[in-house]
Amino acid sequence: MRLRNKPWARDAIAQNPDLVIQQPATWKGNWHRCFGRQAPLYIEVGTGKGQFLTGMAKHHPEINFIGIERYESVLVTAMERAKEAELTNLKFLSEDVYDLLDFFADGEVSRLFINFTDPWPKKRHEKRRLTYKDFLAKYEIVLKEKGDIHFKTDNQGLFEYSLHSFSKYGMILHNVSLDLHNSDFEGNIKTEYEEKFAKKGMRIYRCEAQFRTNEESHNL
């Protein structure tokens, strides 16, 4: 994906510290205080321009949401969307998912979304895929017991790889869809990419993957 340079993005983000959290590590284990309330915490890695997470925050005011996006030129659009919607249950981090454990305590997150991530199709880039086992290990730490991942992609190869990765890690798969928009699944909120792909008639793949409890893993 080629990104347009927006030299003003960094300054715009810096002027909104209540929305794009600076030094997020200081809130590790205390995100409920950052939001000013106790509520389940859902995060999206690679939040892009924020259409999905803004929609989720509108539809689920009872949930606290955090979007993680490392590219400021993209994040600034998500920030403006959230500002316009006046959402108090949505915040962003201009950070890299590699550093996830620096920002969230063990078991602090209830759900994690991965939407239309870069498929990194070459074998030598496997470790960069956000469903690679090393990333799953990070997600497992920050997610609560029985926490889950909701995953969407247009890339069949990445979807098949991810199903295998989830299963090999010992996760439980739910609601696997090979054609989301022609399924009975309700409550789907589209990302920008998803809308674009859907207009072209492309299939959207979706699944939910849940980590096993220690007891469930022991009984395997």
Curated annotation (Swiss-Prot):
Disulfide bonds: none annotated. It comes from Halalkalibacterium halodurans (strain ATCC BAA-125 / DSM 18197 / FERM 7344 / JCM 9153 / C-125) (Bacillus halodurans). Residues 124-129 are annotated as: Interaction with RNA. S-adenosyl-L-methionine binds at E44, E69, D96, D118. Catalyzes the formation of N(7)-methylguanine at position 46 (m7G46) in tRNA. Substrate binds at K122, D154, T191, E192, Y193, E194. It comes from the Bacteria. GO terms for cellular component: tRNA methyltransferase complex. Belongs to the class I-like SAM-binding methyltransferase superfamily. TrmB family. This is tRNA (guanine-N(7)-)-methyltransferase.
